[in-house]
Amino acid sequence: MPRSVNAVASKKHRKKILNFAKGFYGARSKLYTVAKNAVEKSFKYSYFGRKNKKRNFRKLWIKRINAAARENGISYSNLIFLIRKNNIKLNRKCLADLAMKNNSSFKKMIKKFQILYLDL
């Protein structure tokens, strides 16, 4: 009885891995075993990259809010405190966008808070 090998599926799988490895340098894009390791590692890095992207954007938003708040004479932590006290449902992304694109309304918002809470 001849040896049964599923060559079609094996070839398809190898081709899929080599397609993922397109653009990699040298053997990483040509040889299956090397490409398999490179693709696996790249998937791992892309997974962590997606998590880091969220972290980095949050940091950026906080820096932008802090810079805009300090221009108006209030610290970031006090601004967040005042926003929470007034039950304003704006997240950091919206606040950063407001501070960058519509600075005049951001200033008005801060002035209103400072009038309400003069002790800060």
Swiss-Prot record:
Gene3D superfamilies, alphabetized: 6.10.160.10, Ribosomal protein L20
Superkingdom classification of source: Bacteria
GO cellular component: ribonucleoprotein complex; ribosome
Keywords: Ribonucleoprotein, Ribosomal protein, RNA-binding, rRNA-binding
A molecular function (GO) term: structural constituent of ribosome
One BP annotation, GO: ribosomal large subunit assembly
Function (record text): Binds directly to 23S ribosomal RNA and is necessary for the in vitro assembly process of the 50S ribosomal subunit. It is not involved in the protein synthesizing functions of that subunit.
PANTHER family: 39S RIBOSOMAL PROTEIN L20 (PTHR10986)
Family to which this protein belongs: Belongs to the bacterial ribosomal protein bL20 family.
Protein's name in the database: Large ribosomal subunit protein bL20
Taxonomic source organism: Karelsulcia muelleri (strain GWSS)
